[in-house]
Swiss-Prot record:
This is Hsp90 co-chaperone Cdc37. Keywords: Cell cycle, Cell division, Chaperone, Cytoplasm. Forms a complex with Hsp90. Interacts with a number of kinases such as crk1. The keyword Chaperone applies. Residues 201-225 have a biased composition (Basic and acidic residues). Residues 494-508 have a biased composition (Acidic residues). It is found in: Cytoplasm. One of its GO terms (cellular component) is nucleus. Its main location: cytoplasm. Residues 201-245, 488-508 are annotated as: Disordered.
Length: 508
């Protein structure tokens, strides 16, 4: 049976977690690279959330002012810029602009959880314009773009309403995007989320002294006063339990329902959907991996058609599992995800169907290619054994390779004059310096292939010190599926909101 490395494909680590990595990858290097990637994504997500929050707040204030002017002033009065600004300044604070602290104070507990822990620099707040000034600029812009509005008040009102409708459209789209960003943020736990659940102290009282009839007996010693403090920490880390080889194999065992699902023809999507609705528990990453292992075995036996069919069925489980949090969601939510996904791929000409089949082909071709390599290696090993008459122990090598298909390793030369560049030129052997200067990970791996494990690990430590290896990500065309995930997330959120509306007055 071929070795399955898929358990390392989707590793996600936090700042302080211990992880298990591929034997050929340096553990500390992987953790540093992955942490850097997580921090960058977290920072970028917070920047987007802050930008959208400012935009939504600003547009809501602008609409409020435009509505007020349209209600209080006639078409003729709107042509007089001085009168417009005088009316505006009398009703609204001329200096009012975006103020995060004031927003938190005004909204209170009604402000959503993901918006309460943002940090704004002083420059970010100061650089935002006043709302009244923005209205004044809007009038100037409309009159410059449409000269007839300088004398025709009705035309001016028409363009003001048109601009307001565009703002409403932007508000709608940005609200959806903010919901998605906050949903992503809520799925991750960072150190800021950890807090004391409760902290309680109590004092043991002295036991009442019993009156002793016999005065000659010595009195019992008085009870000592003690203070006990109990602290509970929310989201305390769970001890890491290492799985044995048998447990790992048990995790990849195919359930009977999954075996039945694998027999359903690929072109009968309606039957597949009906089966999954009756057995939502198999829509997990674990069962998908078990089917992929079966596909490997079939391809090694040159049963390509059967292997591709198994890949098709396994990806159905994967897509539904990703939409429903890999089996962690309630059965009703998993069923909703099944119905939603199959409705998107039902039509032959739909982009979702095309993207799904493309993923099936790519996955099958990858398995096919790996099996060819495995067969070739088996032939070479057999030939070597026949030639030498004995089994030779293979020497372990360290090779740098990205474990995730959506990331790649990059080779970076440190900037001259920095501490990293000094380490690069003084500690690294000249062979590795030349390989890094080519900026090719293959050239670096060629040098690693010449070293023993101990020497290669020492080189990896120097790599960490001078930062010559980095991780960069790329995104394939999965727009349709990402939109599908967003749609499902919003439907689930709406259902949960409806269920909790009867018992909660406010929603974080």
């Amino acid at each position: 049976m071929p070795i399955d490395y898929s358990k390392w494909d989707k590793i996600e680590i936090s700042d302080d977690s211990d992880v298990e990595v591929h034997p050929n990858v340096d553990k500390q290097s992987f953790i540093r690279w992955k942490q850097r990637d997580i921090h960058e994504k977290r920072m970028q997500r917070n920047i987007e959330i802050k930008s959208i929050l400012i935009q939504l707040t600003m547009y809501a204030k602008l609409n409020e002012r435009v509505d007020y002017l349209l209600e209080k002033l006639t078409s003729t009065e709107l042509l007089d810029s001085e009168k417009v600004m005088s009316k505006l300044n009398s009703e609204f604070d001329p200096q009012e602009k975006f103020d995060y602290d004031k927003l938190i104070k005004d909204k209170g507990s009604t402000l959503r959880k993901g918006l309460k822990d943002l940090k704004f620099d002083r420059e970010e707040i100061e650089n935002t314009p006043c709302y009244n000034e923005m209205i004044e600029d809007l009038f100037v812009q409309i009159k410059d773009d449409h000269p007839e509005t300088k004398t025709d008040g009705d035309k001016l009102i028409e363009y003001l309403k048109e601009h307001r409708n565009r703002i409403d459209d932007v508000l709608s789209k940005q609200t959806i995007k903010l919901d998605d960003l906050l949903y992503q943020k809520a799925q991750l736990i960072v150190s800021d989320d950890l807090h004391t659940g409760f902290d309680r102290s109590f004092l043991n009282k002295d036991k009442p002294e019993e009156k002793e009839e016999n005065q000659d007996k010595p009195k019992a010693p008085e009870a000592k006063k003690t203070t006990v403090t109990t602290t509970e920490t929310i989201n305390s880390p769970k001890p890491v339990e290492e799985n044995t080889d048998k447990e790992i194999l048990d995790e990849l065992e195919i359930l009977p329902a999954t075996k039945e699902f694998a027999k359903i023809p690929s072109d009968n999507l309606s039957k597949a959907a009906e089966f999954l609705i009756k057995h939502p528990s198999i829509c997990t990453e674990q069962q998908k991996d078990a089917l992929i292992m079966t596909a490997f075995d079939l391809q090694l036996e040159n049963k390509s058609d059967e292997a591709k069919h198994i890949v098709h069925q396994s990806l159905l489980l994967q897509y539904v599992g990703q939409l429903s949090d890999n089996g962690k969601a309630a059965p009703a939510n998993v069923i909703n995800a099944i119905k939603l996904f199959f409705s998107k791929i039902a039509a032959e000409s739909s982009p979702a169907k095309h993207a799904f089949l493309e993923d099936v082909n790519q996955t099958f071709n990858h398995i096919k290619g790996r099996c060819e390599i495995i067969k070739e290696e088996q032939k070479q090993n057999a030939a070597n054994k026949e030639g030498t008459g004995e089994e030779e122990e293979e020497e372990a090598l360290i090779q740098l390779k990205a474990l995730d298909d959506n990331t790649e390793l990059s080779v970076n030369i440190p900037q001259e004059g920095t501490k990293e560049y000094e380490i690069f030129t003084t500690k690294l052997p000249i062979e590795f310096q030349n390989a890094i200067k080519t900026e090719s990970i293959d050239e670096v791996n060629k040098e690693f292939a010449k070293l023993k494990i101990e020497d290669a690990e020492r080189i990896l430590e120097i790599f960490n010190e001078c930062g010559v290896i980095g991780i960069s990500g790329y995104i394939e065309d999965e727009k349709e599926f990402e939109e599908l995930k967003k749609e499902y997330a919003h439907e689930t959120a709406n259902q949960e909101e409806d269920q909790s509306a009867s018992v909660e007055d406010t929603v974080d």
